[in-house]
Amino acid sequence: MVLGCPGESRISPERIAGYTAAMKKYGVPLVEKPEEMIGKVDAMLIEAVDGSVHYERAKPFLEAGLPCFVDKPFACSVVDARKMIDLAAKKNVSIFSSSALRYATEVTQYFADRKHGKVLGCLTYGPASTHDRNPGLFHYGIHAVEILYTFMGPGCERVSCVHDEGADVATGHWKDGRVATVRGNRSGPSAFGFTAFAEKGIHTTAVSSRFFYRELLKKVVEMFKTGKPPLDPSVTLEIVAFIEAANRSGANHGSPEAVKA
């Protein structure tokens, strides 16, 4: 990291001072406006917790031809997500977004084992606190949704979601007939985990938080070096569409909603 900008936050403004002090402690120069970094950096990390501002934050850097990692949630609408992806394609630069849970040890080890066969369905869970700036599952529930998509891949057609004060429970139906469910908890334990239903067995495990952010950063650095994102942006776009559909369903008493990416 060679340059940074504290910026502003409408979700966690109280954290800016601490992060600014930490950057200064480690000798990272800071600028007042993000655009001042253009011409002085090779790539950008958009780290605002507020997904609704990611397009406006990423836009000047994508237009300048800089590859971008956009932290979760990539966007809080399909419209904004598509704008970023289309702009990156137009400028021929890489763009990448993911929850670190995609790279948790228990998740990657499942696929490294190569003994389970095709995933037929999945149940994932995790904490799902909410914030008006990141509605519904966009705020913290996106972590469990990312695990779900790591197992199921893209292709979800519709979602039904039951929403109450304690949880969001969203069930997706895939084009090939598979079904998967994500549970975002706002009461009880705040653990992450999954149950994968595969051709050769059922595997259930909790997911540790010890190493996943380190593993995500390895993927970010790899993209900046190679220019190739580790995850196709179309998958990220569908994750945004899945959450949009789940939020609509939850607000409409669980009615099925189409996933429109």
Identify the meaning behind each predicted range:
Residues 1-64, 86-91, 252, 259:
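N-terminal glycine-/serine-/threonine-rich beta1-alpha1-beta2 phosphate-ribose binding loop
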Residues 16, 107, 144-145, 213, ...:
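A general structural signal for well-ordered alpha-helical segments in protein cores
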Residues 32, 70, 97-99, 160-163:
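Short loop/edge segments at beta-strand edges and connector loops
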Residues 36, 41-48, 223-261:
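C-terminal helix-rich "cap/oligomerization" subdomain common to oxidoreductases
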Residues 57, 84, 110, 245-246:
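Aromatic/hydrophobic pocket-lining residues that form π-stacking "cages" and hydrophobic walls in ligand
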Residues 69, 74-134:
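A contiguous active-site-proximal alpha/beta segment in oxidoreductase catalytic domains
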Residues 122-190, 234-241:
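Rossmann-like dinucleotide-binding domain that binds NAD(P)(H)
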Residues 188-228:
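Interdomain hinge/lid region at the active-site interface
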